[in-house]
Curated annotation (Swiss-Prot):
Gene3D superfamilies: Aspartate Aminotransferase, domain 1, Type I PLP-dependent aspartate aminotransferase-like (Major domain). The lineage of its organism: Bacteria, Pseudomonadati, Planctomycetota, Planctomycetia, Pirellulales. The modification N6-(pyridoxal phosphate)lysine is found at residue 210. SUPFAM superfamilies: PLP-dependent transferases. HAMAP family: HisC_aminotrans_2. It is an enzyme of class 2 (transferase). This is Histidinol-phosphate aminotransferase. Homodimer. Belongs to the class-II pyridoxal-phosphate-dependent aminotransferase family. Histidinol-phosphate aminotransferase subfamily. The gene is hisC. It catalyses: L-histidinol phosphate + 2-oxoglutarate = 3-(imidazol-4-yl)-2-oxopropyl phosphate + L-glutamate. GO terms for biological process: L-histidine biosynthetic process. It comes from the Bacteria.
């Protein structure tokens, strides 16, 4: 059997572990630890008893209208709905980057970007962050074969951000579209939605998997100028969003007060997590997302991860060649974070990692 050469050469993207529900404290894939709001649950229940023998709205019109209203956009023609923001990213790579052409991404960041380029038979260029997590000037350099630049903002695994003025300047320096992946933007102090309206080369991708607590339904969207949306609509699957997810996502857009409350609560827990890790001697990168990236001067990150896993707590161990490794810990409930911190301290004791004299696990 003969596959496309690009497929034979590529390595698959490996997502975070998804254990059976209830067996682990799960702090490894940046999900919202709180359930979605009641109106979303009601919308799902109502849609589940609706005419599921019929195809859904191929354009997810109700969601696009609700999103435009919630986000202050001129109209639904500025929004394209997708089966998770990963599908939106797939459409962008498919629409702009041909075989043998290139896309650019920062490093370390979301590894799926490389996979999407590989699927296309395209090239990808990784530009390493300067220490500490700052984009180098070379990230904005043009090249004839460069067709798309992807920038997660906030970034994963670091949780760091590039400011809006920097992004506007970056777009001005490029001759190709700049995709700002705002999967975690609700946890940050600013976003780039207004830049989309003034710059046709800036696109913003969003997901409902993080702040909205809807990772299980798979729904994301693109915000771009209407002519971009119209062109990308040509290459999307005919019915890419199902009726239940459209209903849930539409209802979620009407829950902005709930969103603000849950984000504020998670940000308090995030900052508390940062303080606890620093008290244990970890170097923690200031985060604008729903996770923290930490490294210990004595290392042993893989061993800490394994100790916690054996104790039924999942965090994410990540090792980036030529950059180093570390631990990414999702923001959970306060009780989940308390359990995680206690087990990290026990892991450090077991692994003979130095503990500060006044480290406190309470």
């Amino acid at each position: 059997m003969q596959y496309r050469p690009a497929l034979s050469k590529m390595k698959p993207y490996v997502p975070g572990e998804q254990p059976p529900p209830g067996k682990f404290i799960k702090l490894n894939t940046n999900e919202n630890p709180y359930p979605p709001p009641a109106p979303v649950v009601s919308a799902i229940q109502s849609a589940a008893t609706g005419p599921l023998n019929r195809y859904p709205d191929p354009m997810a019109t109700s969601f696009r209208r609700a999103a435009a209203n919630a986000l202050g956009l001129p109209g639904p023609e500025w929004v394209l709905a997708g089966n998770g923001s990963d599908e939106i990213l797939t459409l962008l790579v498919r629409g702009f980057v041909g075989e043998g052409e290139s896309l650019r991404l920062p490093y370390p960041s979301y590894i799926l970007y490389r996979t999407l380029a590989d699927i296309q038979g395209a090239n990808w260029e990784q530009v390493p962050f300067n220490d500490p997590w700052e984009l180098p000037q070379s990230f904005g350099e043009n090249r004839e074969d460069l067709k798309l630049v992807l920038l997660p903002n906030p970034n994963s695994p670091s949780g760091t951000i590039v400011s809006k003025p920097q992004i506007a300047e970056l777009s001005n320096s490029l001759n190709c579209p700049l995709v700002v992946d705002e999967a975690y933007a609700d946890f940050a102090e600013e976003n780039c939605l207004d830049l989309v309206q003034s710059d046709e080369n800036i696109f913003v991708t969003r997901t409902l998997s993080k702040s909205y607590g809807l990772a299980g339904i798979r729904f994301g969207f693109l915000v771009a100028q209407p002519h971009v949306i119209a062109e990308l609509t040509k290459i999307k699957d005919s019915y890419n969003c199902d009726a239940i997810s459209i209903a849930a996502a539409t209802a979620a857009m009407g829950c902005q007060e709930w969103l603000a409350d849950v984000v504020a609560k998670m940000n308090v827990t995030r900052d508390r997590t940062t303080d606890r890790l620093r008290a244990l001697g970890f170097d923690v990168t200031p985060s604008h997302a729903n996770f923290v990236w930490c490294r210990h001067p004595e290392g042993k990150h893989a061993e800490i991860h394994q100790y916690l896993k054996q104790s039924q707590i999942l965090i994410r161990y990540m090792d980036f060649p030529d950059w180093g490794d570390g631990l990414r810990i999702s923001v959970g409930t306060d009780d989940q974070i308390d359990a995680c911190m206690l087990m990290i301290e026990r892991a450090m004791q077991s692994l003979n990692i130095s503990l500060p004299a006044r480290a406190d696990s309470t």
